């Protein structure tokens, strides 16, 4: 009891306790609309910007296990990408191929290369100039989700279309 009495007589401790009590009572402002998030409304990225591409078009597609075949949902995304890329021709494009953590490094690099090539070929089939496109495989080296679970693995089986040049 002597310690507590000594602490309550210390002005620094009293001030510290008071500040903690006040801070604990303060309400936290949480963003509740797009303006608070700095987006100025959904999809408010400047048309033709790299942010516009990522936010409004979608920069990635996903693959089934051990596959480089373009799924129906991925075809929709790639078709939107091609339309956007054909409208905004100032960008150079790199298609990154990725794989999940299962398999050897060599196998996943080759699988990532096939995925990037499949996405590139689809974009070319929709009119995007092949001279603007490059591919790279990261295999399993750059996961977006890390855990030993199918939900993580499925997020890592992807191709990502990245833009460079023109103020991206």
Swiss-Prot record:
SUPFAM superfamilies linked to this entry: OmpA-like
InterPro entries assigned: Bact_OuterMem_StrucFunc, OMP_bac, OmpA-like, OMPA-like_CS, OmpA-like_sf, Pal, Pal_lipo_C
CDD domains per UniProt: OmpA_C-like
GO biological process per UniProt: cell division
Topological category with respect to the lipid bilayer: Lipid-anchor
Lipid attachment locations (S-diacylglycerol cysteine): 25
Cleaved signal peptide residues: 1-24
OmpA-like domain mapped to chain residues: 50-167
Lineage, broadest ranks: Bacteria, Pseudomonadati, Pseudomonadota, Alphaproteobacteria, Hyphomicrobiales
Function of the protein: Part of the Tol-Pal system, which plays a role in outer membrane invagination during cell division and is important for maintaining outer membrane integrity.
Any single Gene Ontology cellular-component annotation: cell outer membrane
Species whose genome carries this gene: Mesorhizobium japonicum (strain LMG 29417 / CECT 9101 / MAFF 303099) (Mesorhizobium loti (strain MAFF 303099))
Family membership noted in the UniProt record: Belongs to the Pal lipoprotein family.
Keywords: Cell cycle, Cell division, Cell outer membrane, Lipoprotein, Membrane, Palmitate, Signal
Domain of life of the source: Bacteria
Subunit structure: The Tol-Pal system is composed of five core proteins: the inner membrane proteins TolA, TolQ and TolR, the periplasmic protein TolB and the outer membrane protein Pal. They form a network linking the inner and outer membranes and the peptidoglycan layer.
Stored Pfam families: OmpA (PF00691)
The protein's name: Peptidoglycan-associated lipoprotein
């Amino acid at each position: 009891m002597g310690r507590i009495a000594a602490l309550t007589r210390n002005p620094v401790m009293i001030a510290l306790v008071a500040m903690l009590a006040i801070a604990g009572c303060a309400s936290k402002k949480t963003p509740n609309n797009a303006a608070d998030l700095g987006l100025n409304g959904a999809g408010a990225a400047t048309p033709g910007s790299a942010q516009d591409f990522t936010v409004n078009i979608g920069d990635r597609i996903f693959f089934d296990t051990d596959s480089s075949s373009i799924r129906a949902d991925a075809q929709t995304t790639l078709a939107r990408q091609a339309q956007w890329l054909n409208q905004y021709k100032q960008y150079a494009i790199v298609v990154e191929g990725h794989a999940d953590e299962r398999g050897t490094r060599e196998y996943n690099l080759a699988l990532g290369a096939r995925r990037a090539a499949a996405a590139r070929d689809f974009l070319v089939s929709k009119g995007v100039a092949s001279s603007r496109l490059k591919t790279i495989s990261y295999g399993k080296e750059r996961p977006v989700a890390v855990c030993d679970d199918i939900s993580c693995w499925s997020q890592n089986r992807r191709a990502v279309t990245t833009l460079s040049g023109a103020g991206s």
